[in-house]
């Protein structure tokens, strides 16, 4: 009985020692065929990484689980092994940590030039794999080339020489890249070409450029308005070179010969009054030409001014041009202080609107026969 009990106890202890030895044999290099120089290489020649403590332990436990439940999925086995490894104490992990260190040193001795380089898995596009290779997307039309061929928001030339404002833009498409060729048609001096750099900017930068362009347009508009305002008085005076009324300057000694043109712009039509042969005439100092008091009309038309001139011509015919006058002077037509804007802008006023009263200046101006009493000399051009 004693022998049989000893035999039974020895039989019970042997499996335990076998399992422990088997575990260490599984994690030892002998199980990996240490004699083989390619013990840590794959069939393709890739050198595997040295196992750490968890890999040594999980390799042993994975074999046990696969023997007990061969139908269990590999992902489920890994999940259970991870939970169990976290529940182990540090004392239970020590033998596996030592075995992993020994394997690491052996790995360094066998493969001194080894460097960890993780494999780069090629990204497989399912849509591209389904299509035949002849119909695959060309590199010229790939999304990358589209993003690269994105339009530039603003193209600013570097001003050189005269700083030409116009640029001839030519886009040449070659090999999936857009090349912009800019040439300045107006080159000053040595015909320096404007070098333009295309910069891909964000939306914020595009908004800033648009604001800058708006400011530049406003500045150009203000400069244009200012130039028009500067040119406007000159245009007015050039178009409407019209005196308010003819004046008599008795101080000048020379006679004025020629024609004076009256210009009046009303509703797009021009009215010309040409007085010819205004020469030095002998007049009677006592004789004066008086105008019948007429109410000044608020609105004058060419017909009203024609009637007024006709009255003046009738009064001029009543004078005697043959009597000598030593105090007669020259007739000159000059500008007076009158706002010419009313004439050029088509206002309702006229140069021939006289007030109801006759001032001394007016009586002196129209004194004497300073126009010949011939209707042929009064040319009215409408």
From Swiss-Prot:
Compositionally biased tracts (Basic residues): 147-157
Segment forming the signal sequence: none
Stimuli inducing this protein: By chrd.
Phenotypic consequence of gene deletion: Morphants show a significant reduction in head area and interpupillary distance compared with controls. Morpholino gene knockdown does not induce an increased death rate.
Record gene name: sox11-a
Presence of keyword Transcription: yes
Stored CDD domains: HMG-box_SoxC
Transcription found in the keyword field: yes
Assembly: Interacts with nlk.2.
GO MF annotations, alphabetized: DNA-binding transcription activator activity, RNA polymerase II-specific; RNA polymerase II cis-regulatory region sequence-specific DNA binding; sequence-specific DNA binding
Tissues expressing the protein: Expressed in unfertilized eggs but not in early embryos up to stage 13. Localized to the nervous system at the end of neurulation, and restricted to the central nervous system, eye and head neural crest cells by the early tadpole stages. In adults, expressed throughout the ovary, and also in the testis, kidney, brain and small intestine.
Function: Transcription factor that binds to the DNA sequence 5'-AACAAT-3'. Acts as a transcriptional activator. Plays a role together with nlk in neural induction during early embryogenesis.
GO cellular component: nucleus
Protein name, entry field: Transcription factor Sox-11-A
PANTHER family (alphabetical): SOX TRANSCRIPTION FACTOR, TRANSCRIPTION FACTOR SOX-11
Lineage of origin: Eukaryota, Metazoa, Chordata, Craniata, Vertebrata
One Pfam family, short name: HMG_box
């Amino acid at each position: 009985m004693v022998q049989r009990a000893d035999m039974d106890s020895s039989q019970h202890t042997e499996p335990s020692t076998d399992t422990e030895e088997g575990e260490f044999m599984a994690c030892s290099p002998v199980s990996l065929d240490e004699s083989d120089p390619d013990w840590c290489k794959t069939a393709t020649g890739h050198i595997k990484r040295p196992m750490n403590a968890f890999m040594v332990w999980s390799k042993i436990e994975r074999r046990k689980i696969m023997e007990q439940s061969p139908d269990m999925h590999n992902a489920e086995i890994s999940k259970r092994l991870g939970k169990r490894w976290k529940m182990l104490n540090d004392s239970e992990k020590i033998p596996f940590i030592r075995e992993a260190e020994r394997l690491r040193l052996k790995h360094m001795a066998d493969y001194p030039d080894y460097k960890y380089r993780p494999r780069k898995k090629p990204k497989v596009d399912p849509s591209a794999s389904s299509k035949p290779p002849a119909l695959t997307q060309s590199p010229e039309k790939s999304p990358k080339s589209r993003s690269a061929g994105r339009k530039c928001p603003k193209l600013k030339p570097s001003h050189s020489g005269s700083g030409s404002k116009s640029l001839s833009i030519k886009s040449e498409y070659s090999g999936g890249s857009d090349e912009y060729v800019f040439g300045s048609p107006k080159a000053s001096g040595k015909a320096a070409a404007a070098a333009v750099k295309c910069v891909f900017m964000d939306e914020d930068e595009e908004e800033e450029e648009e604001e800058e362009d708006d400011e530049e347009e406003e500045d150009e508009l203000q400069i244009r308005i200012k130039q028009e305002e500067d040119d406007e008085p000159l245009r007015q005076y050039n178009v409407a070179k019209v005196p308010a009324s003819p004046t008599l300057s008795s101080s000048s000694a020379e006679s004025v010969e020629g024609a004076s043109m009256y210009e009046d712009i009303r509703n797009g039509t021009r009215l010309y009054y040409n007085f010819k042969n205004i020469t030095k005439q002998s007049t009677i100092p006592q004789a004066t030409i008086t105008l019948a008091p007429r109410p000044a009309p608020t609105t004058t038309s060419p017909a009203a001014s024609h009637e007024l001139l006709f009255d003046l011509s009738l009064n001029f015919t009543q004078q005697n041009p043959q009597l000598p006058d030593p105090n007669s002077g020259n007739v000159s037509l000059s500008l007076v202080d009158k706002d010419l804007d009313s004439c050029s802008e088509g206002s309702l006023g006229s140069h021939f609107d006289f007030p109801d009263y006759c001032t001394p200046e007016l009586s002196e101006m129209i004194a004497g026969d300073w126009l010949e009493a011939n209707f042929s000399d009064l040319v009215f051009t409408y």
